[in-house]
């Protein structure tokens, strides 16, 4: 199973953009995670499938950029199956993604708090 937070990716990002810029970008990433959690949690009915596909598609790149490997892998899986029409249990997929968003958020919040 992939890591929640890939420290190597974060270190590489820090070298590329400058360590002083990491807190700002992490705040943006954490805000995205919160918004996605809220949006998915509030969604019901037929809109769930479209939101799940949209959010997973958006998460693929942002999660990869920040080394959120487990979230990225899940987003890629959901996005791929969504494009193939293979998302069978939307409610369960949604709950799994919300859980992973929460775990990722908690993990990255601890990094932000540690940096402060």
Language-model features: where?
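Hydrophobic membrane-targeting segments
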Residues: 1-3
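Short acidic-hydrophobic sequence patches enriched in Asp/Glu that either
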Residues: 5, 61, 93
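Long, amphipathic alpha-helical coiled-coil segments characteristic
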Residues: 8-55, 91-112
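Extended, amphipathic alpha-helices with heptad-repeat/coiled-coil or helix-bundle character
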Residues: 32-88
């Amino acid at each position: 199973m992939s890591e929640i937070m890939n420290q190597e990716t974060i270190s590489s990002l820090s070298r590329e953009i400058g360590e002083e810029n990491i807190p700002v970008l992490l705040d943006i990433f954490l805000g995205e995670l919160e918004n996605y959690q809220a949006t998915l949690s509030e969604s019901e009915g037929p809109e769930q499938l479209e939101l799940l596909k949209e959010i997973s598609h958006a998460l693929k790149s942002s999660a990869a950029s920040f080394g959120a490997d487990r979230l990225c892998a899940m987003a890629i899986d959901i996005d791929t199956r969504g494009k193939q029409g293979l998302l069978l249990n939307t409610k369960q997929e949604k709950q799994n993604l919300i859980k992973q968003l929460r775990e990722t958020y908690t993990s990255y919040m601890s990094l932000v708090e540690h940096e402060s």
